[in-house]
Amino acid sequence: MCDTIAAIATPSGTGGIGIIRISGPKSKERLTELFHSVSPKFTDFKPWMLHRGYLVAPTNEFLDDILAVYMPAPYTFTGEDVVELHCHGGHFLLLTILETVLCKNIRLAKPGEFSQRAFLNGRMDLTQAEAVAELIAASSRNEVLLASNRLKGLLGQKIIDIRRRIEELRVWICLAVDFPEEESGIFPLEKFINGLLEIHEIIQKLIHAAERSRCWKEGVTVALAGAVNAGKSSLLNALLGKERAIVTEHPGTTRDFLEECIIVNSLSIRLIDTAGLRVTSDPIEEQGIQKGREKIDEADVILFIIDGTVGVTEESKLLINNFGVERTILVWNKVDLKVPPSNWTELYTSSQVSGICVSAKTGSGIEELLVLLYNFVLSQHNAQEPTFDTIVPNMRQVEVFSLVLEEIRSLYEDIRSGIPYDLCAVMLENISSMLNSIIGFDTPEEVLNRIFASFCIGK
């Protein structure tokens, strides 16, 4: 890491300000060559202060009126000397300035290379580095919260605590191996097993937290299903608050599925409007119905729309029970035209099922439907809204934790069956090494390269 790197750190496009980040031992030296201060009293860059001046090309050509800041190592993001050039945010202007910087024997940074240097220089562990990328990619408040908690180091601290517990168990094993005849070498088997089970429980809770939080990170898919003319497309428009789907009185208007996303209390919901379910001789409509059924089968939640003016039909009852009531919400539409009986959900299925009455035309009940849908998803995933101390590992980390649990279970069975203590010590070292790979202590280089390559350039 002896070379100096640079990249545009702000999103591509046009904006008021664009930032070029430079990191490495030659950062300040190259800044001095390119920057001309507007202040006649300027002599040198004061660290951590913005300096206004002109950026000039090697040909002495004026490029931009900028603010520059020099940040000396080691208390920077990368742990190296860092310079930031705050320029006007024109896309081609930034490219021109970057080309000028790169002419000064500075290399273009690879994707994620600034974060990789921060990790390699000990400014953050691997869980924090991954959190940076997830924070940038977050599309809801709860995703931001989950990523920022890892960026604070909460998961890394939890892993360090688990490793400390494992080291205590390993010390007991080593004493029993090295001093079998002495009092200090008496192996506390039950205490060891209890400690092992406590570690297992801690990791199991982390995995369960990830499973429960899947809806925040991945969102959910909700299919709008029902008979023709039940008002599925009208309901889609009402939920979106805009006219997205074509609505007519003619049956079979929707011949293909439509997809749109909404955010409800930081939960990303992908709504899919499907073709009305019926027997048809139209091959195009039949193809749309088949596609719709596939989307319904794949959906996390089904909003089964009932035409209130038609009421209960045997076909609807059959469809609802085939779809599975555990992922279905019954929606009695057109309540402005006909109010259902108080026990209307029981007319469709003997099982407990959620139901609500709405009018897609007037908007009655739409807000209540969104609340019901939100709570339904949370109940379905056994999820809770994250707080400022919620620790949720990502997919890679969960995979490693799952392997750790398998190793702990094997150790539990083996020590119960009486295997030699020195083999138990080896298994504990293996568990500790797995945990190290999560925070980056023993992570293979190819894994690190793959992780940081997924970052954007400039981060």
Curated annotation (Swiss-Prot):
PROSITE patterns: G_TRME
Superkingdom, natural source: Bacteria
Cofactor: K(+)
Cofactor note: Binds 1 potassium ion per subunit.
Residues annotated to bind (6S)-5-formyl-5,6,7,8-tetrahydrofolate: 21, 84, 123, 459
Binding site for GTP: 229-234, 248-254, 273-276
Domain TrmE-type G: 219-378
GO molecular function: GTP binding; GTPase activity; metal ion binding
Main location (coarse class): cytoplasm
GO terms of biological process kind: tRNA methylation; tRNA wobble uridine modification
EC number(s) per entry: 3.6.-.-
Keyword field: Cytoplasm, GTP-binding, Hydrolase, Magnesium, Metal-binding, Nucleotide-binding, Potassium, tRNA processing
UniProt keyword Zinc-finger, yes or no: no
Entry GO terms, CC: cytosol
InterPro entries: G_TrmE (IPR031168), GTP-bd (IPR006073), GTP-bd_TrmE_N (IPR018948), GTPase_MnmE (IPR004520), MnmE_dom2 (IPR027368), MnmE_helical (IPR025867), P-loop_NTPase (IPR027417), Small_GTP-bd (IPR005225)
Compartments where found: Cytoplasm
Enzyme class: hydrolase
Binding positions for Mg(2+) per the UniProt entry: 233, 254
Physiological role: Exhibits a very high intrinsic GTPase hydrolysis rate. Involved in the addition of a carboxymethylaminomethyl (cmnm) group at the wobble position (U34) of certain tRNAs, forming tRNA-cmnm(5)s(2)U34.
UniProt subunit comment: Homodimer. Heterotetramer of two MnmE and two MnmG subunits.
Similarity field: Belongs to the TRAFAC class TrmE-Era-EngA-EngB-Septin-like GTPase superfamily. TrmE GTPase family.
PANTHER family for this protein: TRNA MODIFICATION GTPASE GTPBP3, TRNA MODIFICATION GTPASE GTPBP3, MITOCHONDRIAL
Protein name according to UniProt: tRNA modification GTPase MnmE
Organism encoding this protein: Lawsonia intracellularis (strain PHE/MN1-00)
